[in-house]
Amino acid sequence: MEAATENQGRILLVDDESAILRTFRYCLEDEGYSVATANSAAQADTLMQRQVFDLCFLDLRLGEDNGLDVLAQMRIQAPWMRVVIVTAHSAVDTAVDAIQAGAADYLVKPCSPDQLRLATAKQLEVRQLSARLEALEGEVRKPKDGLDSHSPSMMAILETARQVAVTDANILILGESGTGKGELARAIHGWSKRAKKSCVTINCPSLTAELMESELFGHSRGAFTGASESTLGRVNQADGGTLFLDEIGDFPLTLQPKLLRFIQDKEYERVGDPVTRRADVRILAATNLNLEDMVRSGRFREDLLYRLNVITLHLPALRERSEDILTLADRFLARFVKEYARPARGFSEEARAALLNYRWPGNIRELRNVIERASIICPQERVEVSHLGMAEQPANNAPRVGAALSLDELEKAHIGAVLATSETLDQAAKTLGIDASTLYRKRKQYNL
């Protein structure tokens, strides 16, 4: 299959009049679209077997072929593709029949370049929105990434999670970055009796102690500089539901006594307001840090840890559940080629072997990112090793002993590893000890 060099959409023009094809093509290519032309139903069918199109302009009078029959076949072959019927004034009634049969719209010949451009932009926008909606609906219907597993250890964890979800016990989820701790937390909320209420997330590393207290418990107007309005806080938002404290190991030590008190008594005060309030909240927390080591070094309260880990679930790294790698890769590929309307339909044997041999330090998050990138840049039906962008990395993700690496190569490898295990660029910049603008420049420099 050919790769689209333009970034706005693939368009198929089907008309038996070469002058119309030429005029439409020049107009649309001037707008930056990728355009293919066919002068018969058979030629259109051949093109559609080789390429993925987002939009088709189909002449209703196509020589010996009936445009309505061609439309029906297109709807079967490429149900996602928007089809605009092109017709003469005398055949408007038939064009209306075509819309009832599944066409998106119709244009009356002769049409102006502005009419063609407007119709194209409108239909491609609808196509993009439909793709995003389908992706979201698929996310709702299907098991979340990494939670549909063939790994015995993962299946045992999921079974335990389902059993404890129906209780109100606090749960601590442990695991490396990218293993799906947040998804498991949201799944537990969905399996619980609190599912109809909110599941509110706080990302602990992103907030200072001062901001964390305000974000968690709320504040009154004038409580501090810039507090022009009162806020209710995440605890209030989660009342009756679940509060998920992501990366709890980064929760400010000075604020841990207030969190402990809330977990024990369900009581809290907003910043700048002495009134004691209550909230019925179930606590889920997750971290990739060793909290017991942090307790021993005085960086985390032992009594808070005991309150958080009534139930502990430890998610295995992706390399420890290798039987799920290809299943997840296939699922990600199917999702992204649908979302981006790309031609890839599977992986070559070499690519599948590379996926299995890689250690995935960034776990499921890294796998998802690798497959998303591959789905975008792959111009054919099979994803090759070169599309994955990780073929030359050694299995242990460390520089080879004795390898002559430049400082730039070392820096690139280090930044790439941090990016793979960070949820946001800000978090990656913080880990690297540089500001976001410097990280942006380095990513551009190293093509990361």
Curated annotation (Swiss-Prot):
GO molecular function, one term: ATP hydrolysis activity
Gene3D superfamilies from the UniProt entry: 1.10.8.60, 3.40.50.2300, Homeodomain-like, P-loop containing nucleotide triphosphate hydrolases
SMART domains, per database record: AAA, REC
Pfam families reported in the protein's UniProt record: HTH_8, Response_reg, Sigma54_activat
Pathway: Glycan biosynthesis; alginate biosynthesis [regulation]
Function (record text): Positive regulator of the alginate biosynthetic gene algD.
Modified residues (4-aspartylphosphate): 59
A single BP term in Gene Ontology: phosphorelay signal transduction system
Residues that, per the record, bind ATP: 175-182, 238-247
Keywords: Activator, Alginate biosynthesis, ATP-binding, DNA-binding, Nucleotide-binding, Phosphoprotein, Transcription, Transcription regulation, Two-component regulatory system
Record-annotated Sigma-54 factor interaction domain positions: 147-376
Residue ranges annotated for the Response regulatory domain, each copy included: 10-124
Phosphoprotein found in the keyword field: yes
Protein name: Alginate biosynthesis transcriptional regulatory protein AlgB
PROSITE patterns: RESPONSE_REGULATORY (PS50110), SIGMA54_INTERACT_1 (PS00675), SIGMA54_INTERACT_2 (PS00676), SIGMA54_INTERACT_3 (PS00688), SIGMA54_INTERACT_4 (PS50045)
SUPFAM superfamilies in the cross-refs: CheY-like, Homeodomain-like, P-loop containing nucleoside triphosphate hydrolases
PANTHER family to which the protein is assigned, alphabetical: ALGINATE BIOSYNTHESIS TRANSCRIPTIONAL REGULATORY PROTEIN ALGB, TRANSCRIPTIONAL REGULATORY PROTEIN
Annotated DNA-binding residue span(s): 425-444
Species this chain originates from: Pseudomonas syringae pv. tomato (strain ATCC BAA-871 / DC3000)
Primary gene name: algB
